């Protein structure tokens, strides 16, 4: 009987110990969960609100100072793809002193400010640790000078107005009229197949936002068809190559009807 009683007491004691461990384990898990929640709330308040502003500023400033001493400071700026954007403009947007912490640079802000330049279509900015900022520019390429409402603009292949400073690009084709900026890329692309003809073309006028008139050297006017004007350009180029365009006293060539061309002389 004494052995049975002793055995029962041991079982009861073991059961009590297991129950206590379970309770302690559950309390521990709850405490950890509560600590995580409190920590998460604190982090959210610290990062996403104005609370602890002075502390944040102090910590960030010290982090920048430490990283600078460790060699993570701005010393080099690499710029690729720059052709027409002024380098000083880029450095001004960068707005950073040499030897300042490279982590202090706000890359998204730099990128957005650079995109404000009408020359820049896209830009990529990154850090190259420990001391370099890399800027890759994708500039808009001017293809023509567009005249509209007595104003002149450089335009790219999408018809986007880049700049009013046309002087450095005076060699580009001059296009005139409503919609001329949008359709200039197609015309320029076709004319580039015939360099001699492109060189003789002074102005391309968009008529009714449907088709083109070309004004050539020698006061010759060419009326192109609304659609499939490539054949008409090929015909004009052939005349030029055979020396039958600029010495025939032509005033106008009406090529709008692909089945019958009309020629007017002075």
UniProtKB/Swiss-Prot annotation:
It is a single-pass type II membrane protein. Residues 1-31 are cytoplasmic. Residues 72-140 form the POTRA domain. Its main location: membrane. GO terms for biological process: cell septum assembly; FtsZ-dependent cytokinesis. GO terms for cellular component: cell division site; plasma membrane. The chain crosses the membrane at residues 32-52. InterPro entries: Cell_div_FtsQ/DivIB_C, FtsQ, POTRA, POTRA_FtsQ_type. Keywords: Cell cycle, Cell division, Cell inner membrane, Cell membrane, Membrane, Transmembrane, Transmembrane helix. PROSITE patterns: POTRA. The keyword Transmembrane applies. It is found in: Cell inner membrane. Residues 53-266 are periplasmic. Belongs to the FtsQ/DivIB family. FtsQ subfamily. This is Cell division protein FtsQ. It comes from Rickettsia typhi (strain ATCC VR-144 / Wilmington).
